[in-house]
UniProtKB/Swiss-Prot annotation:
PANTHER family: TYROSINE-PROTEIN PHOSPHATASE NON-RECEPTOR TYPE 2, TYROSINE-PROTEIN PHOSPHATASE NON-RECEPTOR TYPE 61F. This is Tyrosine-protein phosphatase non-receptor type 2. Disruption phenotype: Newborn mice are viable and do not display physical abnormalities. However, by 3 to 5 weeks of age they develop hunched posture, diarrhea and anemia. They do not survive beyond 5 weeks of age due to severe anemia, hematopoietic defects and the development of progressive systemic inflammatory disease. They display splenomegaly, lymphadenopathy and thymic atrophy, associated with altered B-cell differentiation, altered erythropoiesis, and impaired T- and B-cell functions. It comes from Mus musculus. The keyword Membrane applies. The modification Phosphoserine is found at S52, S293, S298, S304, S320, S339. Substrate binds at D182, C216, S217, A218, G219, I220, G221, R222, Q260. Its EC number is 3.1.3.48.
Amino acid sequence: MSATIEREFEELDAQCRWQPLYLEIRNESHDYPHRVAKFPENRNRNRYRDVSPYDHSRVKLQSTENDYINASLVDIEEAQRSYILTQGPLPNTCCHFWLMVWQQKTKAVVMLNRTVEKESVKCAQYWPTDDREMVFKETGFSVKLLSEDVKSYYTVHLLQLENINTGETRTISHFHYTTWPDFGVPESPASFLNFLFKVRESGCLTPDHGPAVIHCSAGIGRSGTFSLVDTCLVLMEKGEDVNVKQLLLNMRKYRMGLIQTPDQLRFSYMAIIEGAKYTKGDSNIQKRWKELSKEDLSPICDHSQNRVMVEKYNGKRIGSEDEKLTGLPSKVQDTVEESSESILRKRIREDRKATTAQKVQQMKQRLNETERKRKRWLYWQPILTKMGFVSVILVGALVGWTLLFH
């Protein structure tokens, strides 16, 4: 099976057909209703206006007045794999994120982005980075950091999630890939596969637990790549025939726009081909991945790619990064080039709005804390004044009494 995919990869490379193949997938993807995401009360729960969960596959929050969260359940029955693909939490949705993790009985969260990329906030800081716990009063949860294992390109956190109302606690593994550029690909399949198998070894992807929560910024590009590669490798381990294009089309029925660029599609093939060596019984392959990935070196900086490509999620355009299109009919390429600049500006504006909104919320929190302190002072001020006055009288009386009898 891996030989078939390898031949397909070589043909696509030789014929420079990654762009056309990607466009085929994009154009053949179905569009499904996503009305709930567009409700007025849910607008501030979406990081991007054009990335929404379908109504039929969206994850619903339980025991809340509003059950909406921008997250989709991707269920691949033949591989016995279920993933929750979601956007990077916003400041106002971190509480909903942890509620979802609890209700879905998730064992691990896989994070494939940095909180800030290219000076834009891509994700709120929803987990603690020190000994101080984070409390989410809106949904009644707290999160503590138990341990942290930092590698050169990923970090594993062990978190304690507590239901404040019941006192019940659960341990959640947080796998954070720190060097995967937005709209780009990891430096090598070896580093990615080493990370993927690290996640697998935790057991969090098996049907014995609730679905793993996987997110990047929008929950479609990097998250889609991770899910596609893992699913293909599972099917190959089972001896099943794997049609990568068809599998991706099936996964796109659950969440729009999975895999955002031809480069991500090409990288998925590379990772599947390399990962298949392990399924064939090459026991030393994981050791080679670890050596090639150099995970034990000091953490390195994120290498962002300054490229833009126009993406269309099942018929709806969204902003991407600059990348010239090749191998397309001239009319299609001209249309893409004409609209790429305006689409990029739109994505940048949305990122700036999200950043501004986060800063405004932080300012409001500081103002609220200042106001609470002021009210506490106004409450105690007259009491303390009276106590001081009474103390002065008592001291005066004591002094007078002492002088009188001496």
